Amino acid sequence: MAAPRWIGPLLLLLLHFVAAVAGKSYYDVLQVPKGASEDQIKRSYRKLALKYHPDKNPNNEEANKRFAEINNAYEILTDQEKRKIYDRYGEEGLKQFQAQGGRGGGGGMNIQDIFSSFFGGGGGGMEEEEEQIIKGDDVIVELDASLEDLYMGGSLKVWREKNVIKPAPGKRRCNCRNEVYHRQIGPGMYQQMTEQVCDQCANVKYVREGDFLTVDIEKGMQDGQEVSFFEEGEPKIDGEPGDLKFRIRTAPHERFRREGNDLHTTVTISLLQALVGFEKTIKHLDNHMVEIGTKGITKPKEVRKFKGEGMPLYQSNKKGDLYVTFEVLFPKTLTDDQKSKLKSILT
């Protein structure tokens, strides 16, 4: 069977990301902690791969890049030898290992192998199967992101404390097995019942642990969008932990106000500038200068639009607009001579 048409371009992207992923660690890319188990890595990979798969994001270059990053990170972190080298020596150590002919330096798992193990068909179809798994509660945290990070992209270090399940002395009753029995509810009538009877499982307890998480802020993210860390939520005995979700909220800014993909700001000019025109620039969020001057008259509260100077659209090369409201600063007093000159000019 022929390979899907997106495989070729994607392999080129994978080569680009083989050593490093835009400064992010492979654990950050897969949104898992450094000590994540292989099962946790696989589950996180599966969810992210489904989200950013090219079939679901046609003609979306940013999503294709993310998909390539995810596959490369998965290939490294599920190879025990590569993962040990990466954990100990970082990306440079991994480069040297592969350059010296280490296992997987040129071969190893390719993208079709990865998808065969998850979705079947050598990386083709995207038949999403939801697993029925008992999970703990998700934890949702409101995270204030600066306009600068939302404009240029950035990351935040966040301290996170959570409950972790640890072994404890003794045994406990659990849900690992049930016993079926029949109860008589009337003459010749019986009802099948189940009862939890296991008291052989080791006891557990909750312990609070903390660690720093790196939350990646992507350009153009909107209020309410979430950055998820799989299985970093509340734990579940005999199940899997829920997810930790950071819900993005735009932090107030001293100069700009965001409305969707547009930016708004207010600039004060003098009465003279309002009447005769002026030259003026303002500094944008990434420090580039925007020329907002005019040769004409500017009315109080006048709003001018500067196309393409707003916020970047999420996973797009386009940008919104910048709206500048002009406040005119009037003099508090005028001398009789000034009044006379103004009358002669304006009448």
UniProtKB/Swiss-Prot annotation:
One of its GO terms (cellular component) is cytoplasm. One of its GO terms (molecular function) is protein-folding chaperone binding. GO terms for biological process: protein refolding. Interacts with BIP1. Residues 1-23 form the signal peptide. The keyword S-adenosyl-L-methionine does not apply. Residues 25-90 form the J domain. It holds the Pfam family DnaJ_C. It comes from the Eukaryota. It comes from Oryza sativa subsp. japonica (Rice). Coiled coil: none annotated. Induction: By dithiothreitol- and tunicamycin-induced endoplasmic reticulum (ER) stress response. It is found in: Endoplasmic reticulum. InterPro entries: DnaJ-B11-like (IPR051736), DnaJ_C (IPR002939), DnaJ_domain (IPR001623), DnaJ_domain_CS (IPR018253), HSP40/DnaJ_pept-bd (IPR008971), J_dom_sf (IPR036869). This is DnaJ protein ERDJ3B. May play a role in protein folding in the endoplasmic reticulum. Keywords: Chaperone, Endoplasmic reticulum, Signal.
